[in-house]
């Protein structure tokens, strides 16, 4: 297949956005209120993994990295996710706490972008969440040295069985290398698909205890 053939196969893939627009008069003053409304609608619509978000970080050379992570909590203090503290993203966040999140709710013709910086969660917060997870997920956190190179999947499976036997009785302890982050939100952008590619975009920028709202050109 030539490059021209491949281009022809994907260049026509598009659709019209017809689900409705977003108007300034309908926006709440706090973006988290709108985010909660949209997330509830994504759940009600049966979207797969509605809390899945693309998490973008950068390394010391300015190279961006992205991965899908699940949002686990949000409130006025920010948005929370958990991870292995030895992972690539955690190591990058330790050196540069700047972060970007993106929630892609394609079926609803919506997306939400979040910009901010992270802070580590307290051990108490992490412990409470860790013990709310399914037992096998707790074991999985112990097994994987995230982002490290391994020779085969069997290495993980053998370690899982070993730890399952080790922790058969009683509570599984919190690994010292497992934790979480809270994103201190500085701005949020809400995108709603529109007819003729005239999409609606609204940008919330934190100003002290309030939010400045601007409409952006699509």
UniProtKB/Swiss-Prot annotation:
Disulfide bonds: none annotated. SUPFAM superfamilies: FMN-binding split barrel. The keyword Oxidoreductase applies. FMN binds at residues 67-72, 82-83, 88-89, 111, 146-147, 191, 201. Binds 1 FMN per subunit. GO terms for biological process: pyridoxine biosynthetic process. It catalyses: pyridoxamine 5'-phosphate + O2 + H2O = pyridoxal 5'-phosphate + H2O2 + NH4(+); pyridoxine 5'-phosphate + O2 = pyridoxal 5'-phosphate + H2O2. Pathway: Cofactor metabolism; pyridoxal 5'-phosphate salvage; pyridoxal 5'-phosphate from pyridoxamine 5'-phosphate: step 1/1; Cofactor metabolism; pyridoxal 5'-phosphate salvage; pyridoxal 5'-phosphate from pyridoxine 5'-phosphate: step 1/1. NCBIfam families: pdxH, PRK05679.1. Belongs to the pyridoxamine 5'-phosphate oxidase family. HAMAP family: PdxH. This is Pyridoxine/pyridoxamine 5'-phosphate oxidase. It comes from Erwinia tasmaniensis (strain DSM 17950 / CFBP 7177 / CIP 109463 / NCPPB 4357 / Et1/99). The gene is pdxH.
């Amino acid at each position: 297949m030539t490059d021209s053939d491949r281009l022809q196969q994907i260049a026509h893939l598009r659709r019209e956005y017809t689900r409705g627009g977003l108007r300034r008069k309908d926006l709440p003053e706090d973006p988290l209120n709108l985010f909660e409304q949209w997330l509830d609608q994504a759940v009600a619509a049966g979207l797969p993994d509605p809390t899945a978000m693309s998490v973008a970080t950068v390394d010391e050379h300015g190279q961006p990295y992205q991965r899908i992570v699940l949002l686990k909590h949000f409130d006025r203090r920010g948005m929370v996710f958990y991870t292995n503290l030895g992972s690539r993203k955690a190591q990058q966040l330790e050196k540069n706490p700047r972060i970007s999140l993106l929630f892609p709710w394609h079926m609803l013709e919506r997306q939400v972008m979040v910009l901010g910086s992270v802070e580590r969660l307290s051990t108490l917060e992490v412990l409470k969440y860790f013990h709310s997870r399914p037992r096998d997920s707790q074991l999985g956190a112990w097994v994987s040295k995230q982002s490290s190179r391994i020779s085969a999947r069997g290495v993980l499976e053998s370690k899982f069985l070993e730890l399952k036997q080790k922790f058969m009785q009683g509570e599984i302890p919190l690994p010292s290398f497992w934790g979480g982050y809270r994103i201190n939100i500085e701005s949020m952008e809400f995108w709603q698909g529109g007819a003729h590619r005239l999409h609606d975009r609204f940008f919330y920028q934190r100003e002290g205890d309030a939010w400045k709202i601007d409409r952006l050109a699509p």
